[in-house]
Structure formats: structure tokens, C-alpha cells
């Protein structure tokens, strides 16, 4: 899809896309994919859509989830894309790492706390205690030949309310062999101006780190915030097919892709000619209908009067 619009060529860059449909998208109220459905979605995302990475589950949820992850890992290995399969894991005395390993995976997206409130009220730990547990989990994951990415849960609130805590954590975390830092707007509170400010601060303070941005759509700003994050130095974006996700959803894959390419000339590896196909597949499996006027993939999106 192309538009005759002047592009901001000074901003051209290559953006890594991680699809979270099978993990965060499944948090949509009433949505639960069967193992074979998760495999079919994963196959299309990896092979036909050519997304860079897929987050396929949360560790230790159920035996059905374990079966699904194992199937996906086996398939991904046959096409040389096992490194593209990621699982959300926890700081839980190595149980998540072992669970992922038993499934055949070796990339963990480790969930840490990005705000002082989450650290002290949810975990009931001091920042120093939390850091020690994170380091121990990472050491164990590395001993299993894992790649470690790290979520800073509630990052947006942390930047707004407890920046000293967040920077103290990051100052220590950047010393560890973490491949990517995943920065979620967990409660969907950001606007694009805040997203620009916060992402620029992260990039300037930690210029050698890779940052992903993970948007939520509570104010209908997930796509706008994703674009703001990229223009401010984020190297990766998290999306879901049809914008599925808890509460009001996540940034939709199709919208993010076409805006990045058409409006800003950003480079991705996404094959746009299959976006409608993956949208229909997920629509069928999820039971969540795509509105006819949905941008890019809606039935009315290409009709002009």
C-alpha cells in the first residue's frame, strides 16, 4: 500500500516488529486459542507475514499452553526461525526458564518491574532485592544458552512517577547481557508527546541499548504512540493482529506497518500482501469480528467514492 505523500526521509530506519497476538492478544476478554490454532497463526506470522519475532505465551500457564509452545518451537526450528520465538517469563526461582526449555525454546522475555510502585507494592521487595533476583535468573538462563530480553513492566508510570528508581535499575541492568529492553505502556496512559520525551531520555542515557516499545490502546493512541517511539529512537515495536489485547487492545499490526512504510519510509520485513489473510485467520479463531471500517484490513478500507 502506497500513498503520494512526502516522506520524512531523514527518519528512515529499519524497525524490528514483534507480534504478541498469541500472548497479549489472547488476553482479550473471551479469547482463547487452541494449540493447533496457535500453531497456524504462528506459521503464518513467521513464514507468510515474515515478522521478525513472535511472543507466543506466558510461561507456566497450563499444559495446553505448553503443548502449543512446543509445537510452535518444533515448527520454527524446521524453518530456521527458533530464535524468533519468544516466551514471557518471570523471576520465579528459574521455573519459567525450565518451562521454556522443556518446550524447546530458548528466548525469554523476562518480566521485571519498571516502577517503584510495582516493585514495592506488588513484589514487596526493595529495588536492591529485585535486582538481585533478576541477576540470578539471567545467570541461570544464560547457563541454559538462552537469549534474554527484559520487560520493564509499568515503564510509562515509572518514567512519570519514579524516574530515579527506573534509572537506578537501568544503570545496573545495562551491565548485564540483556539483548533488548522492552518498554511497555502497561496501563495505556501515554500520549505521543510523553512517549517522545520518555523514549528520548532512555535513548540518550543508554545509547548502546536496544529498546522496544509496547503500546496499549486505552486512549486510542497505540498507533500514534508507537510511531512517536520509533521517531524518538526505539528500534522495535510490539503489535497484535487486529489490535487484540486486554482492555482496549494493542497496536494493530496492519496499521503500524503501513504507517511506518508509507508515511515515514521506515523499513520492516513485513510482507504486506498477506496482512488481510492473517487478519481473517485471527478473526476466525478469536471470534472477534473486524469492523468493516477498520483501517487497512476492513472491508471498506479500499473503497473510494
Protein language model features and the residues they cover:
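N-terminal capping/small domains of soluble enzymes
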Residues: 2-93
Amino acid at each position: 500500500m502506497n500513498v503520494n505523500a512526502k516522506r520524512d526521509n531523514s527518519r528512515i530506519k529499519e524497525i524490528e516488529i514483534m507480534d504478541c497476538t498469541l500472548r497479549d492478544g489472547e488476553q482479550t476478554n473471551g479469547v482463547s486459542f487452541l494449540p493447533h490454532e496457535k500453531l497456524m497463526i504462528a506459521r503464518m506470522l513467521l513464514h507468510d507475514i515474515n515478522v521478525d519475532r513472535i511472543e507466543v505465551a506466558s510461561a507456566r500457564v497450563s499444559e495446553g499452553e505448553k503443548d502449543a509452545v512446543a509445537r510452535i518451537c518444533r515448527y520454527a526450528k524446521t524453518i530456521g526461525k527458533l530464535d524468533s520465538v519468544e516466551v514471557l517469563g518471570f523471576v520465579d526461582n528459574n521455573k519459567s526458564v525450565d518451562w521454556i526449555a522443556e518446550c524447546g525454546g530458548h528466548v525469554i522475555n523476562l518480566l521485571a518491574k519498571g516502577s517503584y510502585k510495582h516493585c514495592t507494592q506488588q513484589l514487596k521487595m526493595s529495588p536492591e532485592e529485585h535486582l538481585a533476583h533478576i541477576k540470578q535468573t539471567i545467570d541461570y538462563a544464560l547457563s541454559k544458552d538462552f537469549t534474554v530480553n527484559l520487560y520493564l513492566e509499568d515503564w510509562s508510570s515509572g518514567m512519570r512517577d519514579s524516574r530515579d528508581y527506573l534509572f537506578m535499575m537501568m544503570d545496573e541492568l545495562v551491565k548485564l547481557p540483556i539483548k533488548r529492553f522492552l518498554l511497555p505502556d502497561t496501563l495505556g496512559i501515554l500520549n505521543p508527546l510523553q512517549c517522545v520525551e520518555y523514549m528520548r531520555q532512555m535513548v540518550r542515557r543508554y545509547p548502546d541499548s536496544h529498546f522496544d516499545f509496547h503500546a496499549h490502546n486505552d486512549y486510542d493512541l497505540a498507533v500514534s504512540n508507537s510511531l512517536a517511539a520509533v521517531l524518538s529512537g526505539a528500534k522495535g515495536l510490539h503489535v497484535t493482529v487486529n489490535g487484540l489485547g486486554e482492555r482496549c487492545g494493542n497496536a494493530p499490526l496492519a496499521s503500524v506497518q503501513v504507517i511506518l512504510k508509507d508515511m515515514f519510509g521506515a523499513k520492516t520485513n513485513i510482507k504486506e500482501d498477506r496482512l488481510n489473510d492473517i487478519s481473517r485467520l485471527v478473526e476466525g479463531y478469536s471470534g472477534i469480528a473486524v469492523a468493516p471500517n477498520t483501517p487497512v484490513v476492513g472491508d471498506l478500507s479500499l473503497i473510494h467514492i
